[in-house]
From Swiss-Prot:
Spans annotated as Disordered: 371-413, 738-786
Function: Functions as a transactivator of PPARG and ESR1. Functions in adipogenesis through PPARG activation.
Gene (UniProt): Fam120b
Description of how the protein assembles with itself and partners: Interacts with ESR1 and RXRA. Interacts with PPARG; in a ligand-independent manner.
Protein's name in the database: Constitutive coactivator of peroxisome proliferator-activated receptor gamma
Tissue expr: Ubiquitously expressed (at protein level).
Subcellular location, record wording: Nucleus
Superkingdom to which the source organism belongs: Eukaryota
Alphabetical GO biological process terms: fat cell differentiation; peroxisome proliferator activated receptor signaling pathway
Keyword terms, alphabetized: Activator, Differentiation, Nucleus, Transcription, Transcription regulation
GO cellular component terms, semicolon-separated: nucleoplasm; nucleus
Family of this protein: Belongs to the constitutive coactivator of PPAR-gamma family.
Length: 786
């Protein structure tokens, strides 16, 4: 994440870049300077997850009540100081960064293997030095923050770009995160989440102007430096030989800087003393050894340019560029936002550098009447760049649609929704269209559906952090799921990627239209799901799976746009059909909230996975019931005798099921409120682990329920619903002591490790190992198809 080696360099060689600041005091200055405007901090939420998750237990599936309280305290600290928070989450992985994403996932796999080795050898949780965030943490953090009344957005491209863009365009007090890319973007000040003291609101501010002063560079040079050092777009190996040439000729080597630090100093020295001499006179490829990586390099530099910005390293003065006075024209005659334009010398067309064609939010802007901000805010005193504003009150198109009733927020303005090819060709006119397409063949996106209204609704829910994966499926047909705490050596439990795949396949059928199972043509979704044995060299190519909905599968227009009360029943029918549980509708309707969604999930799990036992079911139900009577403090102080590796995997498996419910619920038009399947309402990892250990030892149900008679009736009712639904699928749930009996489980089962891809299309009892893990016989194929 960020620029290679820059974090260590700042800490060891240039500590003066880091200034201790009090955010409360900065907010007071901001209020005095901009009367009537609320000081706002834009938060890179993905950088903050580790900071927010302070619970001692992390391997058991997550301490969700404790985590929710931590988020509430975090928000309250800023609210009491009169500071508004805007949260951004990663919404998708950009094609150009897939390799980096894969590299991190494979590294995480190795870390998870060490975690399970430790658990099985020590029967304890590893120390914080091996900490791995619980599955689903990012997804459920979005919903937690929305529940706490916070504005929460999910990105349509790389989140750090949208964070930096929002911070610049809305004159934010600063950015809160932990990513050196925020030192590179020319945006508002950057605060460290890792150094934040919540009680005093004191933290470290990293000043890009002081960084430039130390390196002898200008702020506009930082994107060039970042690409030469290596980042998520330009691999570190791309300019390795160039960096060492710079180092070999660098005369001011510092002993305390270390090798990486001196490389940064040497490259900066080369930029300031050599490249600056020919800037604007020579093309950048004439000054740097770009070779076949020219397109990737340009993409890397351009990725740091926020709306309205341009790089002097991508501008060629002699050719076709219009003057500064000619650059500022209006994109929309009704809009007051000015957008930089340039003339393409080949096509004689005006092309916008960076625009946001679908801005839907009107945000009060606080503009400094003076060109410079306060010195303490660490902004470039030489910068006279105006912050683009969008003040058109009529630029928000109204869309009549079914929306999540829990949502009240609008789209953020000033965000580029796609990588802007025109911007690259505009800022570098001799850079041809063919070069752009060579840069990344998947940039030119073809959506999976053509209905613009449906895509608008999906996009809105995506940006508002109300849905999960739906827009990705509709827009690009490509989704991903990060690592889960799964034991690659445990052959008795299938990976969550396979267990929930049939549900996802039915969602694909719902979202991508009608087609028949087994057809050679039709939509295919690329799944980048991490599971044991998956090298992630290519995505799994997964086809939709037909489902049966009573009365026929309703269209997305009906599910998402209809206001008719009767449609709510159709939404629920469709949700149950995605889990193949239509026959259990009546029983599930009788289950009270918030246990209904959990009950649905348990039925699906026990039908799918033969190796789940009666003891497992007792533990799942008992923890859900006992959770209703526990305070956060009681859950925090719960002590476990030891840690069981199988229980660790079961906890993660259930939480991944809850994230699958988020996907299905949003795809079906929100038949259930999100509170039905938020983990802090239905699951606690440590409590489940306790019940699992007790159930494994053969404790009576009364003991599992802590002698609470009122819970006993609910327990037996929930158990009856699950067992009855499973029996309809010929799945008999028995205790582990009966596993050797020839009459256990489902007829025709293939023994341990058996799970079903679907119960109605001839896949019953298919071994999960054949679906892609273990030996991976299909690896000889370029992409795997399902």
């Amino acid at each position: 994440m960020g620029v290679r080696g820059l974090q260590g360099f700042v800490g060891s060689t240039c500590p003066h870049i880091c200034t201790i600041v009090n955010i409360h005091e900065l907010a007071e200055r901001h209020r005095n300077k901009y009367p009537g405007c609320t000081p706002t901090i834009v938060v890179d939420a993905m950088c903050c997850l580790r900071y927010w998750y302070t619970a001692e237990s992390w391997v058991c599936g997550g301490q969700w009540r404790e985590y929710y309280c931590a988020l509430r305290n975090f928000v309250a600290a800023f609210t009491s100081a009169g500071i508004k928070l805007i949260f951004f989450f990663d919404g998708m992985v950009e094609p150009g960064k897939r390799d980096e994403w894969v590299k991190r996932r494979l590294k995480n796999n190795r870390e998870i293997s060490k975690i399970f080795h430790y658990i099985k050898s020590k029967r304890d949780q590893p120390g914080r030095n091996m900490f791995f965030i619980p599955s689903g943490l990012a997804i459920f953090t979005r919903f937690a923050l929305k529940t706490l009344g916070q504005e929460t957005f999910c990105s349509l491209q790389e989140a750090d770009y949208e964070v930096a863009s929002y911070g610049l365009q809305h004159n934010c007090l600063g950015i809160l995160g932990e990513d050196t890319d925020y030192l590179i973007y020319d945006t508002c000040p950057y605060f460290s989440i890792g150094d934040l003291c919540l009680e005093s609101l004191q933290t470290i501010m990293l000043c890009r102007e002081k960084l430039c002063e130390s390196l002898g560079l200008r702020v506009a040079d930082l994107p060039l430096l970042a690409c030469l050092l290596g980042n998520d777009i330009t691999p570190e190996s791309m300019f390795e030989s160039f960096r060492y040439k710079c180092l070999s000729s660098y005369a001011s080597v510092k002993e305390n800087a270390g090798k990486k630090g001196n490389i940064i100093l040497a490259v900066s020295d080369y930029i300031s003393k050599v490249l600056h001499l020919y800037q604007g006179e020579k093309k950048i490829e004439e000054m740097l050894p770009l070779g076949p990586n020219k397109a990737l390099f340009y993409k890397g530099v351009t990725s740091y340019l926020l709306p309205g910005q341009k790089s002097p390293w991508l501008v060629q003065k002699p050719k076709g560029m219009i003057t500064d006075k000619q650059q500022m024209v209006s994109l929309n005659p009704e809009s007051k936002q000015e957008v930089p334009m340039c003339i393409d010398p080949e096509f004689k067309q005006e092309v916008p550098v960076c625009t946001n064609p679908e801005s839907m939010q009107e945000v009060p802007m606080c503009m400094d009447p003076e060109p410079n901000q306060e010195a303490s805010m660490c902004t470039d005193p030489e910068s006279k760049q105006e912050v683009p504003m969008c003040t058109d009150s009529e630029s928000k198109p109204e869309v009549s649609q079914y929306t999540n009733p829990e949502s009240k927020q609008k789209l953020p303005s000033g965000i580029d929704t796609e990588f802007n090819l025109e911007a690259l060709m505009c800022t570098h006119p001799e850079f041809k269209q063919e070069d752009v397409m060579d840069m990344e063949p998947e940039i030119k996106q073809v959506t999976m559906v053509s209905e613009s209204e449906i895509l608008k609704v999906a996009r809105m829910h995506h940006v508002h952090s109300e849905s999960y994966l739906v827009y990705n499926i509709l827009s690009s047909g490509e989704i991903e799921c990060s690592n889960t705490l799964e034991d690659e050596l445990d052959q008795a439990l299938p990976s969550q990627a396979f267990i929930y795949r049939p549900v996802r396949q039915r969602v694909y059928a719902l979202l991508l239209g009608d087609w028949k199972d087994g057809a050679s043509t039709g939509p295919v979704v690329k799944e980048w799901f991490v599971y044991p044995g998956n090298s992630l060299k290519h995505p799994d190519l997964v086809r939709p799976l037909q489902m049966t909905v009573q009365g026929g599968t309703p269209s997305l227009e009906v599910l998402w746009l209809s206001q008719e009360p009767a449609v709510q029943a159709q939404r629920l029918d469709t949700l149950l059909a995605c889990f193949n549980l239509s026959s259990s509708r009546e029983e599930l309707q009788a289950v009270e909230s918030p246990l209904r969604a959990l009950c649905c999930l348990l039925i699906y799990l026990f039908v799918q996975v033969d190796t789940l036992s009666l003891e497992d079911l007792h533990a799942f139900i008992a923890q859900a019931l006992c959770l209703q009577g526990k305070s956060t403090s009681q859950l925090m102080h719960l002590q476990l005798d030891y840690i069981n590796s199988r229980a660790v995997q079961l906890g993660s498996l259930l939480v991944r099921g809850l994230t699958t419910l988020v996907l299905v619920n949003s795809a079906c038009g929100f038949p259930w409120t999100t509170s039905e399947f938020m983990p802090w309402n239905v699951f606690d990892g440590k409590l489940f682990h306790q019940k699992y250990l007790q159930s494994e030892k053969g404790y009576a149900v009364e003991v599992l329920l802590e002698q609470n008679r009122s819970w006993l009736t609910k327990f037996h009712n929930l158990k009856a619903v699950v067992c009855k639904a499973c029996s309809k699928e010929n799945r008999r749930i028995v205790g582990r002591t009966h596993w050797d009996s020839p009459y256990t489980g489902r007829q025709g089962r293939q023994g341990y490790s058996s799970y079903r891809t679907d119960s109605t299309h001839g896949h019953s009892g298919q071994s999960w190992r054949n679906q892609g893990s273990g030996g991976r016989q299909h690896e000889r194929n370029h992409w795997r198809r399902y």
